[in-house]
């Protein structure tokens, strides 16, 4: 409530036309995302205290935020407007895009509509009527009538990519349908369509549960899949639940196994090097799949945090946290990191020893999600301090997810812990991969031939790396 009070005089930001155009001009996406994100955060920070207090003090400001959102041509981010059939980075009034930005806002607005419609109607019925219309045409109708969004994976081709966008967008859409659609037949069709789409994400992921995108993306990938599956289970009265499937548990435990210590995590691909994850989310996921490892890890993370901290996240995660926080706080923080973790299909391997060393290495291929050309690379930590590091990724720009990606130094093998072979670095493409990848848990020994990750001009037949 105190946090919400600080937004009672918030000045709603305008996302200008030039903010969208800047992505095309310079590749800068933050100039558009900053005011858009601030408005969305303000809306959430006003909604939750109104739910907690229920006195109507925050309603007028929420209406201002809703109105500002409805007046926007698009809720999609400038960097994602290439999903429009007309392409570009400027929003078209003739079509709608479901991306991470529009989905997140729509998910929040659907909660606001569901819970605050009576309050809005007391002020003026046109407010909720307008909001319901915008959610219908931008999200519900668009999702049911369009197949061309790559993240849906309905037109997935062999070798195609399915990443965190899939469960993330489908979760947002599912929440909108559950809260807004009153026709049971239409709702059933929509729910089934989301299930078909999310199946592609689960099927894309290896059975070992490794997250190609790294720990900092886990909350948006497997973590959002958990949110989706939990909402699906809740919405169907538990009749549709796959929490007993081994792959779902494996995908969850990845986050606990990738923790080095003192806030450091294994950061392959575009992942950040610090941040152990959302303790409340990890606890709920762990409880759903009956994983003591995840639950103990969550308790450990919680013991490190501010005990009086305000829960954060989208409305669904906030409500779920309020339901589970007391149980989490009652657990003892006795997390013990595994001695090793081996992902035979994803080809990630983590090993520790009694001298305080932690080594993380990978085989893999050079077309993974958020790919770096890094087959065979490694990171080394001593007493949780990074010694040999992965530099990670810089600030996202237009260049990051374009044909120019591998002109960025952080994406190149020669800026990872890998050799230049005859002056030649590794190359991008699914065919450039580590081969003969093996791990012996008895000897704590990992090896991989990385020669096959280099192009022909490297003139290398075999190069075995072992740890």
Residue ranges, per PLM feature:
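Long, well-ordered core segments of solenoidal/helical folds
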Residues: 4-15, 62-80, 127-153, 189-209, ...
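Solvent-exposed loop and edge beta-strand segments that line ligand/cofactor-binding
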Residues: 27-40, 51, 86-102, 148-167, ...
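Non-membrane alpha-helical segments in proteins
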Residues: 37-52, 64-68, 103-111
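Structural helix-adjacent loops and short alpha-helical linkers that scaffold large soluble proteins
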Residues: 50-63, 112-136, 177-195, 232-248, ...
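Active-site lining segments of carbohydrate-active enzymes
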Residues: 88-214, 227, 323-334
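Carbohydrate-active enzyme catalytic cores, enriched for enzymes
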Residues: 222-388, 439-441
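Extended, loop-rich substrate-binding clefts of extracytoplasmic carbohydrate-active enzymes
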Residues: 338-357, 423-467
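Catalytic core of carbohydrate-active enzymes
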Residues: 358-440
